[in-house]
Amino acid sequence: MVMSAYPSIRERLFRLAPVASTESVPVLCIRFLLILMSLLVIGVMIAFGVKPVGMWMHRHRFILGASVIAACVLLNISGSSIGMWNYWLGHDMSTDVVWGTPRIMRTDEYVVGTPLAFSQSYSGYSYFNDLFGNKPADMFIVKDAPVLALAELFRPFHWGYILFGSSRGLAFYWSARLVVLFLAAYEFFLCISNDRRQEKHKGVAFVGAILIACAPLVQWWFAVNALPEMLIAIFVSIVCFDRYLGDTESGHRAAYAAVILICAGMFALTLYPAWQISLGYLLAGLILCIVIRHWGHIRISRKDALIFVGEIALFCVILGSAVVTSWGTIQSMHTAYPGARQSIGGGLPPLSLISSVGTLFFPFKDYAVDSVTTNMVEASRFVDLFPLGIILAVFGMIKRKKVDVLSAWLIAVIALFSVFACVGMPLWLSKIMMLTSVTSGRCVVVLGVANIAVLVRAA
């Protein structure tokens, strides 16, 4: 209603008339290149075969990923809905849009997050910014904006703003997170597949990575609450932990440990307990399963231990610097929200657990709200094909007459959070299980990731 009424209000109150749409030459060229590249990939696969091309892309996946990021930064391509400002100011909101349409619902991105990130260039990327409110605002903890601080090491996707400026920094922020999320999910699914030599499950891992990176839930929430960072931190840390235990060279282990600690800092600084706690259950089980996989072959030398202790100390110093600087902000966060939340779950319609495929169509048609969800963002899901993964996993364990620890843990996580989200539990039990900060609607993230993981594992 607001969107339909706004044009007349804009013209009468602000004297702003809509401007005719014009397609710029750069936008048309970018569209042509995207279509050309897609057709080129299809043509190469037809000419040389899907498997050889797929293996070539697998071998060069990191170079290809870096090339995509570089191209997006060079061409200033992002997924921001900042074009909505053209609409509010009486212009054509499709101006400079290569594909899709700006989403009015993503106000927390184009009204809050992106403008705050841009504002940092006017303060020299300072930790506190006095452009908002009656006192300097903590841009690192609350605003999740780029700052020049040691702890920014744990937020590598902000580096583009500092290195390239606001426009190309925004392009880096969007493209790097999507590419890295896809590659991290791909490596993770290769790691947890039943094929330890990772030769037969590349196609399955590719499909799993698509289901994660292109999930409706991930895309609707892409620019807020750091969901991609949480998933990247989990996937990369598990892959590095697996390689840490399987490698004996101290230099390699030092690098793996450093990446794991960066992921730990990234996960901690997302500061969204509703997702962090539920995903923490998943992470704990994955760590345990990796230890079981390498049990009996784990060797930690004194040199490895000393290096790891040194890296832990450096990690604590860097993270501690942010805690000390933002101590007042952190104390405030433990008052009304999220510190005072006392969730007991319940209220999620069980039917929503098996209706994830329908959320693929949300971008094409407005979603009719019901009593539980209020918009397309809240109703979005991972296309996890529940309960297919569980059925395949159970059938496989029965056929092999052997319990698969990882599949069993994933099924247990799915069962726990399905009951918590749909039925609920007493407050005392919710406190014991540290779920009071987790709402029913936010459980769909861990459910989606766990369902996709068990599906890939069982394939």
Specify the residue positions occupied by each region the protein language model found.
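Periplasmic/ER-lumenal interhelical loops and adjacent helix-loop junctions
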Residues: 17-25, 321-402, 406
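Aromatic-rich transmembrane-lumenal/periplasmic boundary elements in polytopic membrane proteins
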Residues: 65-139, 304-364
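Membrane-interfacial entry segments at the cytosolic side of transmembrane helices
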Residues: 54-63, 251-255, 295-313, 402-406
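Active-site lumenal/periplasmic loops and adjacent helix-entry segments of GT-C-fold
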Residues: 82-232
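Start-transfer (signal-anchor) and selected internal transmembrane alpha helices
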Residues: 27-80
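Membrane-helix boundary/interfacial segments in multi-pass membrane proteins
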Residues: 18-23, 168, 172, 217-229, ...
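Hydrophobic cores of alpha-helical transmembrane segments in multi-pass inner/ER membrane proteins
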Residues: 34-46, 233-242, 278-290, 314-319, ...
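Membrane-embedded helix bundles of polyisoprenyl
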Residues: 182-191, 201-294, 304-329
